[in-house]
Protein backbone atom coordinates (compact mmCIF):
# COMPACT_ATOMS: atom_id res chain seq x y z
CA UNK A 1 0.00 0.00 0.00
CA UNK A 2 2.79 2.43 0.91
CA UNK A 3 4.55 1.90 -2.43
CA UNK A 4 1.29 2.42 -4.33
CA UNK A 5 0.66 5.73 -2.60
CA UNK A 6 4.21 6.94 -3.25
CA UNK A 7 3.89 5.93 -6.92
CA UNK A 8 0.60 7.85 -7.30
CA UNK A 9 2.14 10.96 -5.76
CA UNK A 10 5.23 10.70 -7.99
CA UNK A 11 3.00 10.28 -11.06
CA UNK A 12 1.23 13.52 -10.18
CA UNK A 13 4.52 15.31 -9.64
CA UNK A 14 5.68 14.25 -13.11
CA UNK A 15 2.98 16.50 -14.60
CA UNK A 16 4.27 19.45 -12.58
CA UNK A 17 7.83 18.69 -13.66
CA UNK A 18 6.83 18.51 -17.33
CA UNK A 19 4.95 21.81 -17.10
CA UNK A 20 7.86 23.42 -15.23
CA UNK A 21 10.29 22.61 -18.03
CA UNK A 22 7.75 23.38 -20.75
CA UNK A 23 7.48 26.86 -19.29
CA UNK A 24 11.27 27.37 -19.31
CA UNK A 25 12.18 25.96 -22.73
CA UNK A 26 11.24 23.53 -25.48
CA UNK A 27 12.17 19.96 -24.66
CA UNK A 28 12.02 16.56 -26.31
CA UNK A 29 10.95 13.26 -24.78
CA UNK A 30 14.27 11.48 -24.28
CA UNK A 31 15.68 14.62 -22.64
CA UNK A 32 12.71 14.67 -20.26
CA UNK A 33 13.24 11.00 -19.37
CA UNK A 34 16.85 11.78 -18.41
CA UNK A 35 15.82 14.93 -16.52
CA UNK A 36 13.24 13.00 -14.53
CA UNK A 37 15.78 10.24 -13.86
CA UNK A 38 18.09 12.83 -12.26
CA UNK A 39 15.28 13.53 -9.79
CA UNK A 40 14.63 9.91 -8.91
CA UNK A 41 11.81 9.15 -11.36
CA UNK A 42 12.18 5.98 -13.39
CA UNK A 43 9.78 6.61 -16.27
CA UNK A 44 9.78 4.63 -19.50
CA UNK A 45 9.07 6.00 -22.97
CA UNK A 46 5.91 3.89 -22.92
CA UNK A 47 4.69 5.98 -19.98
CA UNK A 48 6.07 9.41 -20.91
CA UNK A 49 4.97 9.66 -24.53
CA UNK A 50 1.28 8.88 -23.87
CA UNK A 51 1.42 11.45 -21.05
CA UNK A 52 2.86 14.07 -23.39
CA UNK A 53 0.28 13.19 -26.07
CA UNK A 54 -2.59 13.59 -23.62
CA UNK A 55 -1.19 16.93 -22.44
CA UNK A 56 -1.04 18.08 -26.08
CA UNK A 57 -4.57 16.78 -26.74
CA UNK A 58 -5.86 18.61 -23.65
CA UNK A 59 -4.23 21.87 -24.74
CA UNK A 60 -1.52 22.11 -22.05
CA UNK A 61 1.45 21.53 -24.37
CA UNK A 62 2.28 22.43 -27.95
CA UNK A 63 4.16 19.92 -30.06
CA UNK A 64 6.50 20.94 -32.86
CA UNK A 65 8.28 18.46 -35.09
CA UNK A 66 11.80 19.36 -36.23
CA UNK A 67 14.21 17.53 -38.50
CA UNK A 68 17.38 16.82 -36.50
CA UNK A 69 20.11 14.99 -38.43
CA UNK A 70 17.56 13.41 -40.74
CA UNK A 71 15.23 12.29 -37.93
CA UNK A 72 12.00 13.92 -36.83
CA UNK A 73 12.19 15.00 -33.20
CA UNK A 74 9.12 16.19 -31.34
CA UNK A 75 9.63 19.25 -29.15
CA UNK A 76 7.16 20.31 -26.50
CA UNK A 77 6.45 23.59 -24.74
CA UNK A 78 3.61 24.97 -22.64
CA UNK A 79 0.58 26.70 -24.02
CA UNK A 80 -0.94 29.61 -22.11
CA UNK A 81 -3.38 27.06 -20.66
CA UNK A 82 -0.41 24.94 -19.55
CA UNK A 83 1.21 27.91 -17.84
CA UNK A 84 -2.05 28.72 -16.07
CA UNK A 85 -2.27 25.13 -14.85
CA UNK A 86 1.35 25.23 -13.71
CA UNK A 87 0.72 28.40 -11.71
CA UNK A 88 -2.37 26.86 -10.10
CA UNK A 89 -0.48 23.68 -9.24
CA UNK A 90 2.42 25.65 -7.77
CA UNK A 91 0.05 27.61 -5.55
CA UNK A 92 -1.68 24.43 -4.39
CA UNK A 93 1.65 22.71 -3.77
CA UNK A 94 2.99 25.73 -1.87
CA UNK A 95 -0.12 25.78 0.34
CA UNK A 96 0.17 22.05 1.03
CA UNK A 97 3.89 22.20 1.82
CA UNK A 98 3.38 25.14 4.16
CA UNK A 99 0.63 23.29 5.98
CA UNK A 100 2.38 19.93 6.21
CA UNK A 101 5.83 21.22 7.06
What do the PLM-derived regions correspond to, one by one?
Residues 1-6, 101:
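Short, Lys/Arg-enriched, disordered terminal segments
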Residues 48-50, 55:
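Basic amphipathic alpha-helical segments that dock to polyanions
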Residues 6-47:
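N-terminal helix-turn-helix DNA-binding core of bacterial DNA-binding proteins
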Residues 84-101:
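Amphipathic alpha-helical dimerization/coiled-coil segments
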Residues 58-72, 77:
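Beta-hairpin "wing" of winged helix-turn-helix
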Residues 72-89:
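Basic, amphipathic "hinge/linker" alpha-helix immediately C-terminal to the N-terminal HTH DNA-binding motif
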Amino acid sequence: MKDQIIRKIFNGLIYIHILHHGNEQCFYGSWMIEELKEHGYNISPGTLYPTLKSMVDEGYLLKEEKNVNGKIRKYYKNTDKGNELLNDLKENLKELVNEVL
